[in-house]
From Swiss-Prot:
Mg(2+) 1 binds at E415, E422. Homodimer. It holds the Pfam family tRNA-synt_2. It comes from Shigella boydii serotype 18 (strain CDC 3083-94 / BS512). It is found in: Cytoplasm. Its EC number is 6.1.1.6. Keywords: Acetylation, Aminoacyl-tRNA synthetase, ATP-binding, Cytoplasm, Ligase, Magnesium, Metal-binding, Nucleotide-binding, Protein biosynthesis. GO terms for cellular component: cytosol. The modification N6-acetyllysine is found at K114, K156. Its main location: cytoplasm. Its cofactor is Mg(2+). Binds 3 Mg(2+) ions per subunit. This is Lysine--tRNA ligase. Belongs to the class-II aminoacyl-tRNA synthetase family.
Length: 505
């Protein structure tokens, strides 16, 4: 047996022994009838204590004689004879406990406390004081075991280092890694901040179907499920767009939804098949109004959550404080591929030649607009590091957007990029029912030609438009990618609590 295999075998034996010992301790607690008590109540979390009392000296704390009750997971323990120090972790952070044998009821220290294990969940009462090193601590007068942990913490509090294990066992990741806990706290703050921002602007939050008979609102491959009661195949939604615009037809002039979308596509550092989007629709507005809204939203969130408008992402500082750059798609191609002759982007054969020269395989079903879009994505997208709006998307790749009044080959649409990736997509909505019907037919033709991401024909949506959709603008923002930016995370799995993973066999 190799040394590495021997070490692995020893580790398994050690773990099995520890599991056995912990279960024996639980069995003993069951015999005493105190295995899982539920009558302990805390009155502070660790962050509340630090916020209120870190600034006070020990003499002041002793004079105040403050008694508190806390609860959390025992992360470290230093036993020094008749006294010990414990690090207790709760939702707010950590607080130190000072546990002395003579200050607890008889037998608690030796017969109970010293037999508890790291990872156990404790309740503690006592008085606040500061150690000689100035650390805020609780001098315990009561200490109880609330939950017996049957498994040890990962690597004895050095954190869960295996990346895949962090995703599969997120609970261990959250116990062990401060960075992960902070990421998901920021995510929650972002969601709350978006909701507050939208309400302040007069928007109403709504909910639309997650299962749809006709998937629509985006070009993507859907997941299929079956409704037993209706004996009907249905699709997990790829976007809520068409339902939200039905609500605008119905008279709700400013609506938004934050919810999950599902797309049966690949998994990468930027893509998870189940992801969170915020979509909004605003009557009597155009795409320019939503450019302003998007810029204001990101600036507001950065200031409110991070306390500044400069955000560090990798080795780049993203500046949300200054006006965001605005380029047309063709301007971006020219900027990042200067040798491009702009006239070539108006000709199918010339554009196809450019695309093929930079390694793009041109599908038979693509028209000029799709080719130009693919060229943009290949030569420009990765360079859009600072916040940038790209406008003038071809109508061919924008089946739901309003055509431009001057040039009907392009639409009044923008995509929003930060850090070299798309974060948001917005446009003036197509409210011409006849034009929409024809574009749906074009999408059906593309699907018949082999494009499995082309849209279905949605007859009811066309009927809704025939009742009259006011001039409207819509916007979708990827929440997961937004969280990645605000937390300096470089894979989408780091910002989704339970990302899609292949099952372990």
């Amino acid at each position: 047996m190799s040394e590495q295999h021997a070490q692995g075998a020893d580790a398994v034996v050690d773990l099995n022994n520890e599991l056995k010992t912990r279960r024996e301790k639980l069995a003993n607690l069951r015999e005493q009838g105190i295995a899982f008590p539920n009558d302990f109540r805390r009155d502070h979390t660790s962050d509340q204590l630090h916020a209120e009392f870190d600034g006070k000296e020990n003499e002041e704390l002793e004079a105040l004689n403050i008694e508190v009750a806390v609860a959390g997971r025992m992360m470290t323990r230093r036993i020094m004879g008749k006294a010990s120090f414990v690090t207790l972790q709760d939702v707010g952070g950590r607080i130190q406990l000072y546990v002395a044998r003579d200050d607890l009821p008889e037998g608690v220290y030796n017969e109970q406390f010293k037999k508890w294990d790291l990872g156990d969940i404790l309740g503690a009462k006592g008085k606040l004081f500061k150690t000689k090193t100035g650390e805020l601590s609780i001098h315990c007068t009561e200490l109880r075991l609330l939950t017996k942990a049957l498994r040890p913490l990962p690597d004895k509090f050095h954190g869960l280092q295996d990346q895949e294990a962090r995703y599969r066992q997120r609970y261990l990741d959250l116990i062990s890694n401060d960075e992960s806990r902070n990421t998901f706290k920021v995510r929650s703050q972002i969601l709350s901040g978006i909701r507050q921002f939208m309400v302040n602007r007069g928007f109403m939050e709504v909910e639309t179907p997650m299962m749809q008979v006709i998937p629509g609102g985006a070009a993507a491959r859907p997941f299929i499920t079956h409704h037993n009661a209706l004996d009907l195949d249905m699709y997990l939604r790829i976007a809520p767009e068409l339902y939200l615009k039905r609500l605008v037809v119905g008279g709700f002039e400013r609506v938004f939804e934050i919810n999950r979308n599902f797309r049966n596509e690949g998994i990468s550092v930027r893509h998870n098949p189940e992801f969170t989007m915020m979509e909004l629709y605003m009557a009597y507005a155009d795409y320019k109004d939503l450019i302003e809204l998007t810029e204001s939203l990101f600036r507001t969130l950065a200031q409110d959550i991070l306390g500044k408008t400069e955000v560090t992402y990798g080795d780049v500082t993203l500046d949300f404080g200054k006006p965001f750059e605005k380029l047309t798609m063709r301007e971006a191609i020219k900027k990042y591929r200067p040798e491009t002759d702009m006239a070539d982007l108006d000709n199918f054969d010339s554009a196809k030649a450019i695309a093929e020269s930079i390694g793009i395989h041109v599908e038979k079903s693509w028209g000029l607009g799709r080719i130009v879009t693919e060229i943009f994505e290949e030569v420009a997208e990765a360079h859009l590091i600072q916040p940038t709006f790209i406008t003038e998307y071809p109508a061919e790749v924008s089946p739901l957007a309003r055509r431009n009044d001057i040039n009907p080959e392009i639409t009044d649409r923008f995509e929003f990029f930060i850090g070299g990736r798309e974060i948001g997509n917005g446009f003036s909505e197509l409210n011409d029912a006849e034009d929409q019907a024809q574009r749906f037919l074009d999408q059906v033709a593309a699907k018949d030609a082999g494009d499995d991401e082309a849209m279905f024909y949605d007859e009811d949506y066309v009927t809704a438009l025939e009742h009259g959709l006011p001039p409207t603008a819509g916007l979708g923002i990827g929440i997961d990618r937004m969280v990645m930016l605000f937390t300096n995370s470089h894979t989408i799995r780091d910002v989704i609590l339970f990302p899609a993973m292949r099952p372990v066999k």
